[in-house]
Amino acid sequence: MTKTLPKDFIFGGATAAYQAEGATHTDGKGPVAWDKYLEDNYWYTAEPASDFYNRYPVDLKLSEEFGVNGIRISIAWSRIFPTGKGEVNPKGVEYYHNLFAECHKRHVEPFVTLHHFDTPEALHSDGDFLNRENIEHFVNYAEFCFKEFSEVNYWTTFNEIGPIGDGQYLVGKFPPGIQYDLAKVFQSHHNMMVSHARAVKLFKDSGYSGEIGVVHALPTKYPFDANNPDDVRAAELEDIIHNKFILDATYLGKYSDKTMEGVNHILEVNGGELDLREEDFAALDAAKDLNDFLGINYYMSDWMQAFDGETEIIHNGKGEKGSSKYQIKGVGRRKAPVDVPKTDWDWIIFPQGLYDQIMRVKADYPNYKKIYITENGLGYKDEFVDNTVYDDGRIDYVKKHLEVISDAISDGANVKGYFMWSLMDVFSWSNGYEKRYGLFYVDFETQERYPKKSAYWYKKVAETQVIE
């Protein structure tokens, strides 16, 4: 049976400042930790990325032509405050005003994120969000943006608090490249959630118009053997690290006893302790019912198996299928069922996981109000033929995920939109330019855009709300 989506559903495309803009030192932009980190550790940099800094009129015109009526954009904090605080950079402010004006001219609603992995270098090298002073700096930056950019109707504080802590302190593929420090992971999650809560409270107390929420990456975690209590426990602990800890902070304003039991177990095994203060919980509690929406980024699920051994994580950054490894001491290891498909980067394709995650939020956090799927898509080594890409695999992936969103809506979940990652090809943080996600193919040499087969398919779905 053909499935449909509501008439007012947003069919969006997603971008991020650092992955799309290029112009990393242009017009007064301050440095971010990624600038040097990519030069030192990877085979690519963020120049020119998709040159969105100059080419956004082209991308927004294409959006309008292809039925994309929402766009996720992030503001580069260091374009506004080059050192994260103090002096404002007027050229950065002007750029975003021009960008948002173009969005509205093209009838593409901007959903604007304040922080998408790109803390200014001056603050990042001072501990990033492990340093509590940076909570204040973030709230001040947020307040400036709320006041300045009154044309924005949808704000999100952070993109993917979970993967930031994960990338910086567990996997070690984000600057500062620390591995296996679970205490830092949880502390980063916590301090960023306090920053989020304080920004949301300020937004509401100040009476700004528009809506505000947060974007969480929520990969669903399953036990490898649902009948084995040890595998069930491994999945629960992995879920706490990546999902439950930050969801509790968002919607309960505290960490449930079950969540803290898991956190304490993980830290007991791996070492370290957390600094959780009364004023933190006051801030979390004050904001827990003020979020207008939750953004869910969903790409994959994981299966967890009980495991007794040391932590070892190997990141597959080059698309060499089967080269990744993930096992955490006292938690478990990832082991997927053989019949579940994977991408070349070992990302597990499992649309049912998105349905399960949406329904979990609905059941466990009934004050969620509404959900946008703020990222979902398929990374490929696209083959450019006849000025396009025949990306049937991507179409199939997105179709199946839209279908489970339709199912979730039918089953009572309030899901209001979908943003495909990514609008146009951008560079991938730890995979470079080879891993493409866009509706529009970007020739990174010439910066020309070419609609892929998926763009024509997406346009039809957006126009008809029929998933076929």
From Swiss-Prot:
Please list the residues that make up the active site: E160, E375
Amino-acid positions noted as binding D-galactose 6-phosphate in the UniProt annotation, renumbered to this chain: Q19, H116, N159, E160, N297, S428, W429, K435, Y437
A Pfam family this chain is assigned to: Glyco_hydro_1
Q: Which GO terms describe its biological process?
A: lactose catabolic process via tagatose-6-phosphate
Its Enzyme Commission number(s) read 3.2.1.85
Q: What is the similarity comment for this entry? A: Belongs to the glycosyl hydrolase 1 family.
| Listed name of the protein | 6-phospho-beta-galactosidase
Look up and give the organism this protein is from: Streptococcus pyogenes serotype M28 (strain MGAS6180)
Q: Which gene encodes it?
A: lacG
